[in-house]
A protein has these predicted regions:
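Long, flexible, surface-exposed domains enriched in hydrophobic/aromatic residues
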Residues: 208-216
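Sec-dependent signal peptide hydrophobic core
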Residues: 5-13
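Conserved small/polar residues in nucleotide/adenosyl-binding loops
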Residues: 217-221
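Amphipathic alpha-helices that form helix-helix packing interfaces
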Residues: 63-70, 89, 96-103, 159-162, ...
Length: 221
């Protein structure tokens, strides 16, 4: 069944690549050429436009919205440490992760061009490095600052960024971790890393849909 479900995706990807190649060929024509699209190119363009609008943009918008919600729920958890708030964070994390896994069907464009895939989804997690970060008081202080998301994105390596670091802090044996087992400095780290994750997911959305489609007004470059 999966083979048949994948066919529309493969067809759309082929259409995008074929149409882009055709357009580039026309641009490289030293004589200018006929700028009007052929009927075949128009069909390819329609397929590509439909795939971009109804699949890529919808997926990246859902991903960006859920990662923004994840940051806010992590902040709420740090302010009010309850098991219910842990569960709320974990539910939002899983929603965001589900959108990301859908997007793995088309990791071309911004996801590969800007290195976003390895930045937010490198595995395995560098657990020793994470534990060292928890002992580094200057780094914890930096992750408490207003620009902690930017600091994390620049200073932490990909093995400490993205989904898997947050997952380690929030889950235990596949279930939400007891709030009593989560330290404040671990939440500080999780919030900073989630902020960087959100920024990268908005970069994906903007790259495909344009900045005007993004509601997060404080997005940093």
């Amino acid at each position: 069944m999966k083979k048949f479900l994948r066919f529309p995706l493969y067809a759309a990807m082929a259409a995008i690549m074929t149409f882009n190649f055709s357009a580039c060929s026309d641009d490289d024509d030293p004589d200018g050429g006929d700028t009007e699209l052929s009927e075949k190119d128009k069909r390819y363009q329609a397929i590509a436009d439909q795939f971009t609008k109804n699949t890529v943009i919808v997926t990246y918008t859902g991903l960006a919205d859920q990662t923004e919600a994840l940051v806010e729920k992590l902040k709420a958890l740090k302010a009010d440490k309850t098991d219910d708030n842990v569960k709320s964070v974990c539910e939002t994390f899983l929603n965001a992760r589900a959108w990301w896994e859908k997007s793995e069907a088309f990791l071309f464009g911004a996801a590969s061009d800007f290195g976003i895939d390895p930045h937010i989804d490198s595995w395995p997690l560098d657990l020793d490095g994470l534990l060292d970060e928890m002992k580094n008081t200057s780094h914890i202080t930096a992750m408490e600052a207003e620009d902690a998301d930017v600091w994390a994105g620049v200073k932490l390596g990909p093995e400490l960024l993205g989904f898997h670091g947050i997952e380690y802090i929030m889950f235990e044996a596949g279930s939400p971790k007891a709030v009593s087992k989560i330290k404040d400095k671990e939440l500080t780290y999780a919030i900073a890393v989630a902020g960087d994750l959100r920024n990268k997911c908005y970069q994906l959305q903007i790259s495909w849909a344009g900045a005007d489609t993004v509601s997060y007004t404080h997005l940093r470059a």
